[in-house]
Regions:
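Catalytic cores of alpha/beta
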Residues: 73-84, 125, 129-146
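Active-site beta->alpha loop and helix N-cap motifs at the rims of alpha/beta catalytic domains
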Residues: 1-44, 171-174, 178-180
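Histidine/lysine/aspartate-rich catalytic loop segments that bind and position anionic ligands
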Residues: 60-99
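Acidic (Asp/Glu)-rich catalytic clusters
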Residues: 2-6, 32, 55-56, 82-85, ...
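Glycine-rich phosphate-binding active-site loops on the catalytic face of alpha/beta enzymes
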Residues: 37-48, 90-99, 128, 141-161
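Alpha-helix-loop-beta-strand connector modules within alpha/beta enzyme cores
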Residues: 1-11, 56-70, 104-123, 131, ...
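Active-site-adjacent beta->alpha loops and helix N-cap segments on the catalytic face
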Residues: 1, 19-25, 43-60, 74-79, ...
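Structural preference for beta-strand elements that scaffold enzyme active sites
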Residues: 9-13, 37-38, 64-66, 87-89, ...
Length: 181
């Protein structure tokens, strides 16, 4: 991907269990060589020793640690998350499992505003974005970016084995990106 497009950001998303199997310094060295820009460990609280080690290793290598801020995040914790985040804040639009609920436009806008009151770090909104229309509504919240994940994963799962999956998936992605121009 990096050789194809030097401008697109590459974010690796995973779970803390992976870091128990892979020495953190080696992990960061390897992902830097591979061209990654940032890491998001979705289930690691910032108080966790391993996340602190990861954050330091990423910072030492000029890479970003992306943190989640959910609607249930209290003000003190939000401020702590902002202090240790780099790259952008991943603003979670809905409580619960990604891909299940739809985002509420007013709630998203209010949460984006509350984050932007206390930081200049970009805010990217994700969770609950099931359609291009949802993406457009979220984009209008004042966020700096829209993250679509589960919808694309579901599309691929539902169409595995279909002829021309790559082309049809490209059209699916384009339907989202066109409304965001």
């Amino acid at each position: 991907i990096r050789s194809y497009n030097k401008d697109v950001g590459i974010l690796l998303m995973g779970y803390i269990a992976n870091l128990y199997k892979y020495p953190i310094k080696k992990f960061v060295d390897d992902i830097k060589k591979a061209g990654a820009d940032a890491v998001l460990v979705v289930d690691a609280p910032h108080e966790l020793k391993e996340e602190n080690e990861l954050r330091n290793a990423l910072n030492d290598n000029g890479l970003s640690l992306i943190k989640l801020a959910a609607p249930t995040t209290d003000q003190k914790r939000l401020e702590d998350i902002i202090k240790i985040s780099s790259g952008f804040i991943y603003q979670v639009n809905v409580s619960g499992v990604t891909g299940v609920k739809s985002a509420n436009e007013t709630d998203v806008t209010n949460f984006v505003k509350s984050i932007k009151k206390i930081t200049n770090i970009p805010v990217c909104s994700g969770f609950g974005i099931k359609s291009p229309e949802d993406a457009k509504k979220v984009a209008n919240s004042g966020c700096n970016g829209v993250i679509v994940g589960s919808t694309f994963v579901k599309y691929i799962q539902d169409n595995l084995g279909a002829p021309h999956l790559t082309q049809s998936f490209g059209k699916q992605v384009k339907s989202f990106s066109e409304v965001l121009k």
